[in-house]
């Protein structure tokens, strides 16, 4: 049995609004008056559990679209912001103790990074954290939610799977549909009505639960088909 933990990147491993504000800066020349101020206000509301936005990138895109910015222009703004990911123009913060956490989990589970983001800048960030080699596989431009399904399905052939992310619809719903376990982190963790295996503000907060899951999963025997007992913590 080989357990697998599938991590999202933005909002899960990479936290803070630096990359989001870099995206907003690139979109601002095309948007309306006081756009950046409106983005900052909406981000604060999102962080407090309100606003109804999917994540920070949704805040930036939605407000720009409401100002008449076309999808193609927003896509270009996003791409330009990712080119500077991990630089002073788009600073990224890591989950506290990320290297130790990944090192610990890697003793018991295969670690996979699966993100909708393009590769641009991500390896630079992982290298700056010293964790690039902690991952057994890395998938970019996955096309979640649908694109996550084959990754989860393949991992389940080897053993238990835990998907970790900050957007239930994209990062966790495909895992739930296949019977895998899930961990919801980020601003929506405390308010989301979705049923998940565990939830917390950050991976660091959930570290004991995730480590316990990994140790248990690594020593487990395959469950009978259709059996998926799960308790939310």
Question: For each predicted feature, which ranges?
Answer:
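An amphipathic alpha-helix signature
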Residues: 20-28, 57-61, 119, 123
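Asp-based, Mg2+/Mn2+-dependent phosphohydrolase catalytic module
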Residues: 1-2, 99, 103, 112, ...
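Active-site neighborhood of HAD-like aspartate-dependent phosphohydrolases
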Residues: 1-41
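A metal-dependent, Asp-based hydrolase signature
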Residues: 41-87, 99, 103
